[in-house]
Amino acid sequence: MELTSKDGNMVVDFYPIKDWSNNLIPNRILKVLSFRGDQQKKMIISRDEFYYQVREYIKECKYKVTNEFMPAQFINQEV
């Protein structure tokens, strides 16, 4: 899912994550912050935190949902 700020400068992407065996990792979401097209930060958050943050970005920060496609991303289990 992609959320974009009103001015279009800040983009927040959220993706489910999977291991190298292609198994989805439950209750974990990859969050990627980008500013003007440059990736700033990646972090793994809980699914509850994902729901909370999406709500806050939309309600409080007035971000718009610009893409609902959420392909699972590979992540190292040791992270």
Residue spans for each PLM region:
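Short, hydrophobic/aromatic-rich segments at coil-to-beta transitions
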Residues: 1-3, 30
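Acidic, low-complexity, intrinsically disordered interaction modules
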Residues: 11-72
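Short intrinsically disordered terminal tails
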Residues: 1, 75-79
